[in-house]
Amino acid sequence: MKKLSAYILITLIPLLLFACSKPLPTELVGNESSDEQSSLEFNTISSDDELLYKNGYDSTGTDLSVPSTSVVISASSIKTTYKSKTEVKELAEAAFFDREMPVKRQGGKLLGYRTKLLGVVSFNNLQARVVPFMASFREHGAIKDTLLGSYFLLYKNNNSGDPFNFVHDSNIHFRLKGIMNRSDEFEISTPKEISAEVDVSGSLSNNDLSFKIKWDKALQGKIQILISGLSISQKNTVPFAKIYTDDKGLAKIPSSFLKDFPLANFDRIVFTLSRRKTTEYKSGSIIKDNTIVAQTIHSIQLDIPK
């Protein structure tokens, strides 16, 4: 259960990266016309400042930021591709945070908030399970785990697990049934599925390693591309940078952008593309301030040409 919880936390609240990051945007200007590629804005990620979530070989490499609202509801469809093999995970989650009960790391840095259970949660009339909410973080070079409470989950890996189906470009019905006949329910809008491929050019030894990322464009909104390094021996994924760009289907990552990342210390580089939709729900009888998002994610792992 601990390993599963660590994995799930990678996908719970990647949406908060848009809202909670402290951006210092830099533009990467390519040779493509504006019809093909927009300028890219990126934030580098400090391992000293970010929470880390390790889960082994199927990592999406997404870090978890401290939630900005007391309710976070997320539905995700995640594809993880390595060479010719693709695994598919579908999940729906709901976490209710007690913002009067912060959890801090050594030195007083905020790690997160304790969670609470407000009733019974269902997605598409499937009752979600209550599972541990675990956070992992790096402290003095070591990975430590902290239990923040419990949250609600439906999870399917390929065809194994809960019978939850994430339907793209559609809706997922959410319901929270509390005490005293109080309840909240609404539809969560889902985005068009994202599917990507990555072309590699050059190598680390020649200092000319670069990548071209192509995906099925939506022509509206933005996508996030997370770049991470994956260590097979340590079963650990470390995020390097978050890139934001218009959803036009093309992004080029030049060697000049990669030169400061410690790629030589990792076996694979991971590109995680996320397309998401936000659902507005102002206030219900139980749910007040909230973040509600559905996301389609494609995570591509590539052996690093040394």
Q: What is each residue range found by the language model?
A:
Residues 250-306:
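Hydrophilic extracytoplasmic domains
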Residues 23-164:
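Solvent-exposed N-terminal domain segments of exported/luminal and surface proteins
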Residues 162-181, 263-279:
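Short, aromatic- and glycine-rich surface loops/edge beta-strands on solvent-exposed regions
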Residues 178-186, 290-297:
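Short, exposed coil/turn segments at beta-strand boundaries within extracellular/luminal domains
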Residues 181-192, 282-286:
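Edge beta-strands of extracellular beta-sandwich domains
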Residues 187-251:
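Short helix-loop boundary/capping segments
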Residues 1-8:
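Bacterial N-terminal signal peptides that target proteins for export
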Residues 16-19:
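C-terminal motif of bacterial Sec signal peptides marking the signal peptidase cleavage site
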